[in-house]
Amino acid sequence: MMLPSHSPRPWPARAGLPRVDTARALAALTLLAAALASPPAGADTRTLCTIVADAASGRVLAERGEGCATRVTPASTFKIALSLMGFDAGVLTDAHAPVLPFRAGYPDWGGDAWRQPTDPARWMRYSVFWYSQQLTQRLGQARFASYTQRFGYGNADVAPGPGEFAGMKGAWNSGSLRIAPREQIAFLRAIVNRTLPVSAHAFEMTDRITLIDAQPDGWIVHGKTGTSSPGDDGRFDRARAYGWFVGWAARGTRAVVFAHLIQDDAPHDVSAGLRARDALLAELPALALPAAGAVPPAR
């Protein structure tokens, strides 16, 4: 299946890179360094990790923060993996099927947006937790665990157990499943380079429903936010919330993958995931560094 014209392919063709404009590269590098050295708005939010890497080579363009190797809950960023599973297994068929109805008793802490009939595109856009649960139930525990293992996704621990959100009921939501930002980068590169053990249709549909929008300088961004907190019982602590934004950005033959993780030290009105997304997207022009301008990871 071919992607529609409005959703360009996010992976680079095997072609030579354009000539590097040294002055532009140095200016962009300076901007990126300044951006990564600055914490998100608000003294009560910490940047645990920001990584940007070339999708084709894996070369790290920038790395900052002391939490890049530390595993935490993936929260709703795991929907990218769930999308690949669902489309590969045939549980999901296209961006608008299946449409599942909201039923009394489903999690609805996301408000009215979660109390609507939901299809895969709406699920990803509004991060509808109960749709994830319905997907994993249709996969079944064995297939769900097998996919997670084969994806090499963090600790791949989605084993069933006691608790409201154990196993396929929500292991990714402050549960047993954990992943580090560096592991997110490896997983995202496998998506961009299409090396995961799933069908072309699964890649194409996941690409379609994760599209964010076009950014300055012609970059096309795909990604997913996530908001959760420490612990393994699915309970949310607003005063210590994690905020993720992970994904990939492409322009022409170049693609980068990114993972940005923050943590709050006090409650906020706007979710940590949305704030992580906005902070990362604001710096996207600086992420458009040519490969020759790459820098080693900051330690």
Question: Model features per residue range: what roles?
Answer:
Residues 63-69, 116-117, 125-132, 163-173, ...:
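Flexible glycine/proline-enriched surface loops and loop-helix/loop-strand junctions
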Residues 43-62:
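Short N-terminal segments immediately surrounding and downstream of signal-peptide cleavage
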Residues 58, 71-98, 123, 184, ...:
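Active-site SXXK
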Residues 111-120, 134-193:
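Mid-domain, small-residue-enriched loop/turn segments at the edges of structured enzyme/sensor domains
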Residues 88-105, 198-203:
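Short, well-structured active-site flanking segments
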Residues 1-21:
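N-terminal secretory signal peptides that target proteins for export/translocation
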Residues 47, 56, 67-71, 137-140, ...:
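Structured C-terminal helix/loop/strand segments within mature extracytoplasmic catalytic/sensor domains
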